[in-house]
């Protein structure tokens, strides 16, 4: 039987394996040389680790937004300009059960997992179009998939609707056909919308 050479393991494949492990054991910021068993603080709960994972993704988004601002002069745009790019990005609404008023855990978890799954096509677009550190986008894409799997474990009836392949191909073709200005605006809007969605998700996880 042929053995697998370590030289065939790509950085992305390594990241995928590492992030899948995070689904059951999240990394948490502890002082060098300490772990959860040696730290004087209390052990982190599953909810705490979920929050840390969301914050990890938010950190990646912040880094990408800063990179766009510093390297491509694409900083915070006005809402009016962003609104011109009428993407159907997932958003939180009162009916989704994620707000403190009218909170419903099962409904909220369904919204978060479905919304993050819908964001995958836009992250795929970023992976192809972003003119910067693509490894950060790949890591963020994998991390959101891991987060979906984690949250599905908390659901009574874990079902996530996936985008239709034909509709997905059509949307990607439409996004890729845009001019350079619209591509940059779309990239910024996707990052900002995912950031907003995760911020709402983080608040919801805190009251679960």
Swiss-Prot record:
Please provide, in alphabetical order, the Gene Ontology terms of the cellular component aspect for this entry.
Answer: extracellular space; interleukin-6 receptor complex
Keywords assigned: Acute phase, Cytokine, Disulfide bond, Glycoprotein, Growth factor, Phosphoprotein, Secreted, Signal
Keyword DNA damage assigned to the entry: answer is no
| Subcellular compartments | Secreted
Q: Which InterPro entries match?
A: 4_helix_cytokine-like_core, IL-6-like, IL-6/GCSF/MGF, IL6/GCSF/MGF_CS
Q: Which Pfam families match?
A: IL6
Q: Which GO terms describe its biological process?
A: acute-phase response; glucose homeostasis; hepatocyte proliferation; interleukin-6-mediated signaling pathway; liver regeneration; positive regulation of cell population proliferation; positive regulation of multicellular organismal process; positive regulation of receptor signaling pathway via JAK-STAT
GO molecular function terms listed in the Swiss-Prot or TrEMBL record: cytokine activity; growth factor activity; interleukin-6 receptor binding
Phosphoserine: residues bearing it: 78
Residues of this chain annotated as glycosylated in UniProt: 71, 184
Annotated S-S bridges: 69-75, 98-108
Its main localization is: secreted
Q: Where is the signal peptide?
A: 1-27
**What does the sequence similarity comment in the record state about its family?**
Belongs to the IL-6 superfamily.
Q: What does this protein do?
A: Cytokine with a wide variety of biological functions in immunity, tissue regeneration, and metabolism. Binds to IL6R, then the complex associates to the signaling subunit IL6ST/gp130 to trigger the intracellular IL6-signaling pathway. The interaction with the membrane-bound IL6R and IL6ST stimulates 'classic signaling', whereas the binding of IL6 and soluble IL6R to IL6ST stimulates 'trans-signaling'. Alternatively, 'cluster signaling' occurs when membrane-bound IL6:IL6R complexes on transmitter cells activate IL6ST receptors on neighboring receiver cells. IL6 is a potent inducer of the acute phase response. Rapid production of IL6 contributes to host defense during infection and tissue injury, but excessive IL6 synthesis is involved in disease pathology. In the innate immune response, is synthesized by myeloid cells, such as macrophages and dendritic cells, upon recognition of pathogens through toll-like receptors (TLRs) at the site of infection or tissue injury. In the adaptive immune response, is required for the differentiation of B cells into immunoglobulin-secreting cells.
Question: What binding partners and quaternary form does the record give?
Answer: Component of a hexamer of two molecules each of IL6, IL6R and IL6ST; first binds to IL6R to associate with the signaling subunit IL6ST. Interacts with IL6R (via the N-terminal ectodomain); this interaction may be affected by IL6R-binding with SORL1, hence decreasing IL6 cis signaling. Interacts with SORL1 (via the N-terminal ectodomain); this interaction leads to IL6 internalization and lysosomal degradation. May form a trimeric complex with the soluble SORL1 ectodomain and soluble IL6R receptor; this interaction might stabilize circulating IL6, hence promoting IL6 trans signaling.
- Know the name of this protein? Interleukin-6
Protein encoded by which gene: IL6
